[in-house]
């Protein structure tokens, strides 16, 4: 049995857990939260009926899941060479030959095509934004910037921040300041989140010759960059003034807590890995808490 036959044989036994790894389901699920929040705010602020908007929300969530999962699968296809070098990636089905390249590409493009069809069925802006997200993530991030510049994380933050725009346009069919504010929050959140992870894995990235900021410029430059994005994030809740003073205060406190944690990195003899772990965990909690606040406070305003 040749290698291609072996790969095809292995791919027939791909488990659901492995499929989740291929499409990076954890990343996808995290992006569905701001996507839903975008739709929810469009419903509340434009006085749409939630019940009558459920079909659009479901189509948006399914379409977004498919295009993000498909783009991530294509990213895994392209990154097989570097993933095979990095110790933390050894259990990926694309590395241990649990799925053939042919089946991986069929899965990837199939998901993206169906997802885009659903988004375009909603309206043209949703489909176009989804397409821009795919092109940005696959071409400008995965293929180009990830391997060639320390700005890769910032460049990848543009396509990574489109979910709330898709969510909003799925309901309203246009882009508003509120939608842009949600986009900016996700955009600023990503460098902090991924730099924290990159600090923990800087040796792996160096081994794979990936120019992540901590690997190329070191910890000092990285923590300054993270602090910069924390400062930029600080005033963004004020762009969501339509949610009221309570939201602005709570979101600002959330930002200040993260800013304080960022400042602790400038203490003498900081344990870099321990600090990066704290920043990474805070970033995960931040994403959930911020968008839950968006939904809950806007819900309270309805009554």
UniProtKB/Swiss-Prot annotation:
Q: Which CDD domains does the entry link to?
A: PT_UbiA_Cox10
Keywords for this entry?
A: Cell membrane, Heme biosynthesis, Membrane, Transferase, Transmembrane, Transmembrane helix
Q: What is its EC number?
A: 2.5.1.141
| One term under GO cellular component | plasma membrane
- Residues that span the membrane, as ranges: 25-45, 54-74, 118-138, 151-171, 177-197, 230-250, 280-300
Q: Which InterPro entries match?
A: Protohaem_IX_farnesylTrfase (IPR006369), UbiA_prenyltransferase (IPR000537), UbiA_sf (IPR044878)
Q: How does it sit in the membrane?
A: Multi-pass membrane protein
Superkingdom of origin: Bacteria
Pfam families named among the record's database cross-references:
UbiA (PF01040)
One Gene Ontology BP term is: heme O biosynthetic process
Functional pathway:
Porphyrin-containing compound metabolism; heme O biosynthesis; heme O from protoheme: step 1/1
Quickly give the catalysed reaction.
heme b + (2E,6E)-farnesyl diphosphate + H2O = Fe(II)-heme o + diphosphate
- The enzyme class is transferase
Enumerate the GO terms in the molecular function aspect: protoheme IX farnesyltransferase activity
Keyword set includes Transmembrane helix: yes
Give the subcellular location: Cell membrane
Q: Identify the main location.
A: membrane
Q: How does it assemble?
A: Interacts with CtaA.
Question: What further fact does the record state?
Answer: Carbon 2 of the heme B porphyrin ring is defined according to the Fischer nomenclature.
The record's function comment reads: Converts heme B (protoheme IX) to heme O by substitution of the vinyl group on carbon 2 of heme B porphyrin ring with a hydroxyethyl farnesyl side group.
The family classification in the record reads: Belongs to the UbiA prenyltransferase family. Protoheme IX farnesyltransferase subfamily.
Tell me which PANTHER family the record gives. PROTOHEME IX FARNESYLTRANSFERASE, MITOCHONDRIAL
Listed name of the protein: Protoheme IX farnesyltransferase
From which organism does this entry originate? Staphylococcus saprophyticus subsp. saprophyticus (strain ATCC 15305 / DSM 20229 / NCIMB 8711 / NCTC 7292 / S-41)
């Amino acid at each position: 049995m040749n290698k291609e036959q072996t790969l095809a044989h292995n791919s027939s036994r791909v488990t659901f857990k492995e499929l989740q790894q291929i499409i990076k389901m954890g990343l996808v699920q995290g992006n569905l939260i701001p996507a839903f929040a975008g739709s929810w705010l469009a419903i509340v602020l434009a006085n749409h009926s939630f019940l009558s908007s459920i079909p659009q929300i479901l189509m948006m969530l399914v379409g977004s899941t498919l295009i993000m999962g498909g783009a991530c699968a294509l990213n895994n296809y392209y990154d097989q060479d570097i993933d095979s070098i990095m110790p933390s990636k050894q259990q990926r089905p694309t590395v241990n030959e649990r799925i053939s390249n042919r089946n991986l590409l069929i899965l990837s493009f199939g998901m993206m095509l169906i997802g885009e069809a659903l988004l375009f069925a909603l309206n043209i802006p949703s489909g176009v934004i989804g397409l821009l997200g795919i092109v940005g993530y696959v071409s400008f991030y995965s293929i180009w910037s990830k391997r060639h510049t320390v700005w890769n994380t910032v460049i990848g933050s543009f396509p990574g921040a489109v979910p709330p725009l898709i969510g909003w346009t799925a309901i309203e069919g246009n882009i508003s300041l509120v939608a842009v504010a949600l986009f900016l929050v996700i955009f600023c959140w990503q460098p902090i989140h991924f730099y924290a992870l990159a600090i923990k894995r800087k040796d792996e990235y160096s081994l794979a010759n990936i120019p992540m900021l901590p690997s190329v410029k070191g910890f000092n430059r990285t923590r300054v960059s993270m602090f910069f994005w924390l400062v930029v994030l600080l005033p963004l809740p004020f762009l969501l003034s339509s949610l009221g003073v309570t939201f602005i205060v709570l979101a600002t406190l959330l930002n200040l807590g993260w800013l304080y944690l960022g400042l602790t990195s400038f203490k003498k003899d900081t344990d870099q890995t321990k600090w990066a772990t704290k920043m990474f965990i805070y970033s995960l909690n931040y994403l959930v808490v911020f968008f839950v606040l968006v939904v809950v406070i806007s819900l309270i305003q309805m009554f």
